């Protein structure tokens, strides 16, 4: 290793015009460090990850969770699926109805196991964004019957243990929605009675308002172990400090994962503690593994959105994470001697109380560290020399390891997580020449590594000719590859009433509106393919299960999903159980392009074919033209999709799409 030309080692007699910062444990320690984490869900943000083939899927997981390799995350937080749209898709509930339970739906169980496989000490958190409709008894409020909601959540905790041998460490309340003190206390009591006294409650995963309620209600204060706030801008409030509870930024970042996103992440990882005394920061999301044209595309620590090609990108936020995670562990303590640098930037120091010391320094500039929210007040950062004086139990330290990153916005040739030559402290003093947009880790820890795998396959678009007949005996996941549910839940289904051509199908299984988090559509929909597709031929066998009122659709050029799914436009070809069809320009059916009689009914398989080319669309039923040349002025492109008229059972088979 070469000596970095920005490293400056001085002694007392050198007389540099440096600013001095004391690192000392004699005045006592600060708060206990709880770890850095990532969030899968809220929603469906890891949807495409599961469909990667090996070895690429395992490589991605190593970059996220393997200790001393990449991000080396200490915490994994997952959505407790609630059958509803929760940002980039729906995640299935373990209980679609109160009378059933299935602990193998979705992929969060799998992801938690993969994280634990790599790091047995990783902390696990579950948080609901939405709830199946039965929990709300037909309302949009999950707190009317707090015992029902608490038991629903505890069933998920028990399923994690009994079916996957996963011990959940923390449970949340209702993401970014109103909290209910009665429910929180009922949940605490129910957890204790079920034997989960070790599981802590995080509340309320929104703003700081719960802190005042906790000060007014000692029983609520006792029930909550962690105050979790979202996007705090690195600041806390007096009431939260007065509770004497752990303070976490339990969802943060949510920023496009280029170098500015890396600057945002590096800054808040330090300053959430320096300014706000928050001892954990969790990134939404852990990995951008969903169609990029959905909400908040690429707002993850790394990107894996092409399972069909195997391509993924280890983005710079991974290495900003490593500057903290590879040199600390939950259970370490911040020192009281942390703070801001005189010419901009910040530093934190942590110890394991066994002689190890880690100092993390960041000098991110305002323009190069803006997160998606909240707005960032102006501040200045300039080059500087910072001298750290090691005192107390650290005074004897001589050689310390140095890891360095530089986000170079001028040349574009930055440095990410590079190990430099050790720095030697002289008489307890060590100095660094700091430029802007840099991160240094100075540490006694010697186990860090910059993990590396060979380049993954090159990026390529979704296949232009794609077919799925959904025939699989023991599917590893409940969803078919690449389909991304945006309202409702579409699962592999073994059709015991048809052992011939439709024995294996894809079935929509949510039959009542969930207690929603976002504005789900009134129709169910699952998208697939390439957002740039314009001229498309889509076909699928469909089976309406609801007599008289049921209906299904096949669609092309679908231009919206996520939280905007209600506004989705495209070409939607519907058939109904009442013997009619419609072609609409939107999912809500407000703009009708064609309509008429189809002779369709429930309980019969039909083959729908939708062809869209240029400004015209044509549809057939069982191979015979049903309508043609419907004028389509917009949208110009979008995904293919399938779905149902309402929250109802329906089946799909032999899906095929050919893009021009």
Swiss-Prot record:
Q: Where does substrate bind?
A: 87, 129, 175, 373
The chemistry this enzyme catalyses reads: a beta-D-galactosyl-(1<->1')-N-acylsphing-4-enine + H2O = an N-acylsphing-4-enine + D-galactose; beta-D-galactosyl-(1<->1)-sphing-4-enine + H2O = sphing-4-enine + D-galactose; a D-galactosylceramide + H2O = an N-acyl-sphingoid base + D-galactose
- Supply the alphabetized keyword list: Disulfide bond, Glycoprotein, Glycosidase, Hydrolase, Lipid degradation, Lipid metabolism, Lysosome, Signal, Sphingolipid metabolism
Q: Name a single GO biological process.
A: galactosylceramide catabolic process
Subcellular location, in the record's words? Lysosome
Instruction: Extract the signal peptide range.
Output: 1-18
Q: Which domain of life is it from?
A: Eukaryota
Q: What class of enzyme is it?
A: hydrolase
Entry GO MF terms = galactosylceramidase activity
Return the protein name: Galactocerebrosidase
